[in-house]
């Protein structure tokens, strides 16, 4: 079976071989065969035991579509019927505003398990649902506590999704992600972070609600390849865009010209 050494302290949740056998509902020889072929590589712990990293299991399921017999053993979700992401929006909306974390988790992680990418989950499912929550809140049909609870539920789901993403290589490109002053929206910037992680990047969250001057300082200190800011709430979008250029981008080009930058989010889309 293909073996790799596990480094102590690495963020890489491991599954014992027998638990994987029960989860997939297969015999041990099948798991060993997949390991020998490279489809499901195992790792060796310091004690010499063979285990499989959760991201490797997720990759195997996404590539093969193999059914899951006992998903609860590894915190997975049951194999469901494939359907377009947009057809699940109403169900996710209802689950979030009513605080049904288990159902929300089943939907999002189920799609990922079936092969959907993190960017598509954000663009085609999670983003549209939260825009609808915002519209319904503005119209008085969703209460403040429901909007906040929806964010908490989704953050829990995305935290779970993080466990299934591979750990980036130590020399992978570095990206910084954050939000500007008075913008404390967590879900959009977490999706940006997971999108970069899924592409093999190292990611450092610089924080939420930061002044542009502090974002400039931390960018200079870390020298990333990419700086990503998500702006969901801006009191004066046009004024912010001018300051973004003058206080952040122009000085950054002078001191760190190799740093690329990206600015997005609902507030930016509405301003453009």
Where are these regions (language model features)?
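Residues in the recognition helix of alpha-helical DNA-binding motifs
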Residues: 34
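Flexible loop/N-cap segments at domain edges
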Residues: 177
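Long amphipathic alpha-helical segments
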Residues: 28-30, 39, 43-166
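Polyanion-binding surface elements
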Residues: 2-30
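A general structural motif
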Residues: 181, 185-187, 206-219
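Cofactor-cradling patches in redox/metallo enzymes
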Residues: 210-271
């Amino acid at each position: 079976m293909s073996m790799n050494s596990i480094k102590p302290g690495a963020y890489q949740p491991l599954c014992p071989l027998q638990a994987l056998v029960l989860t997939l509902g297969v015999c041990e020889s099948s798991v060993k065969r997949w390991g020998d072929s490279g489809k499901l590589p195992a790792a060796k712990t310091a004690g010499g035991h063979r285990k499989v990293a959760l991201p490797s299991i997720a990759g195997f399921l996404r590539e093969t579509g193999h059914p899951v017999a006992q998903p609860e053993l590894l915190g997975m979700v049951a194999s469901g019927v494939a359907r377009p992401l947009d057809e699940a929006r109403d169900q996710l909306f209802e689950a979030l505003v009513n605080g049904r974390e288990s159902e929300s988790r089943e939907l999002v992680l189920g799609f990922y398990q079936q092969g959907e990418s993190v960017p598509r989950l954000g663009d085609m499912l999670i983003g549209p649902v939260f825009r609808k929550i915002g519209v319904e809140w503005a119209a008085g049909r969703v209460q403040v506590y429901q909007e906040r609870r929806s964010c908490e539920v989704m953050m829990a789901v995305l935290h779970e999704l993080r466990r299934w993403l591979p750990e980036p290589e130590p020399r992978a490109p570095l990206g910084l992600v954050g939000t500007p002053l008075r913008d404390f929206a967590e879900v959009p910037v977490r999706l940006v972070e997971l999108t970069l992680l899924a592409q093999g990047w190292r990611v450092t969250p610089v924080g939420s609600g930061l002044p542009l001057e502090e974002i400039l300082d931390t960018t200079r200190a870390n020298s990333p390849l990419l700086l990503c800011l998500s702006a969901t709430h801006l009191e004066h979008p046009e004024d912010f865009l001018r300051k973004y250029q003058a206080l952040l981008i122009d000085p950054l080009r002078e001191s760190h010209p190799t740093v690329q930058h990206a600015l997005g989010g609902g507030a930016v889309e509405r301003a453009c």
